[in-house]
């Protein structure tokens, strides 16, 4: 039995129809009840196997069905993955996410996946993977290896889903989330704004997520990154206020979940990102690439954090390998210069 309020579509629709400033005020109040409003969880995402995916997700440049110019790459060597994780940690990330362009992993891949989970965990980082669909055995093996989070997005509402993906069903996505949860792994699941969906579809997506038996611990909200060669390359741009509104509704509906600004941040100016944080976003992906799409450079993120008075969650640093962590702390703590201003002091 669910241990949290069940939402109805009419209730969610009412939230989307609220005046924006009233909605933001409500979302910020709820956010402060459950989180430190000045703290942001920082994750890094690495593509451990890029391209040649057999699925037909219309937004994705990694699909083998579309000519996007993306070159397929084999699985990364274990040592290369661990080196990337170490650099991510020392740049300030507390969670290391690893993604593979698969419909699902094969049994032959499991020892490799278990090894990199164990290696990243040994560094003191939280681990997350996104590998497509899982069966019960695979979910349990990843749990036994120490995997903390598994990402499997619902993408959109059940009603609109068939317009975007035909190679796996909505129910298969829900089934994977259930298997992950039953294995004892935390769930990361969200969706994409800008696929051509209606506001009702956005409400339907959040309704599905919030009404899971246990809501996801992490909810990534992506803004569509339009890639030439994909069927959605000519979609209309997402209005910034519509995106901010979606963040706020997600925060209200899932008050204890981390709401993550995910793909599309490169397209957002600082003011839009600031309003997303006000709306209750408290997690970002950090670094120059998000799988195969651009992401703001690390220094740019640090500058924005300092302007807004935000602090990344801290992580332990390996002795003798802390240059980037020192730069992170120096950027956030040094007195104002011409490059920065303290928004909290205005």
From Swiss-Prot:
Domain of life: Bacteria
One Pfam family, short name: BATS
Function statement: Catalyzes the conversion of dethiobiotin (DTB) to biotin by the insertion of a sulfur atom into dethiobiotin via a radical-based mechanism.
Keyword terms: 2Fe-2S, 4Fe-4S, Biotin biosynthesis, Iron, Iron-sulfur, Metal-binding, S-adenosyl-L-methionine, Transferase
PANTHER family: BIOTIN SYNTHASE, BIOTIN SYNTHASE, MITOCHONDRIAL
Protein's organism: Salmonella gallinarum (strain 287/91 / NCTC 13346)
Catalytic activity line of the entry: (4R,5S)-dethiobiotin + (sulfur carrier)-SH + 2 reduced [2Fe-2S]-[ferredoxin] + 2 S-adenosyl-L-methionine = (sulfur carrier)-H + biotin + 2 5'-deoxyadenosine + 2 L-methionine + 2 oxidized [2Fe-2S]-[ferredoxin]
Lineage: Bacteria, Pseudomonadati, Pseudomonadota, Gammaproteobacteria, Enterobacterales
Pathway recorded for this protein: Cofactor biosynthesis; biotin biosynthesis; biotin from 7,8-diaminononanoate: step 2/2
UniProt cross-references to InterPro entries, sorted A to Z: Aldolase_TIM (IPR013785), BATS_dom (IPR010722), Biotin_synth/BioAB (IPR002684), Biotin_synthase (IPR024177), Elp3/MiaA/NifB-like_rSAM (IPR006638), rSAM (IPR007197)
Record's protein name: Biotin synthase
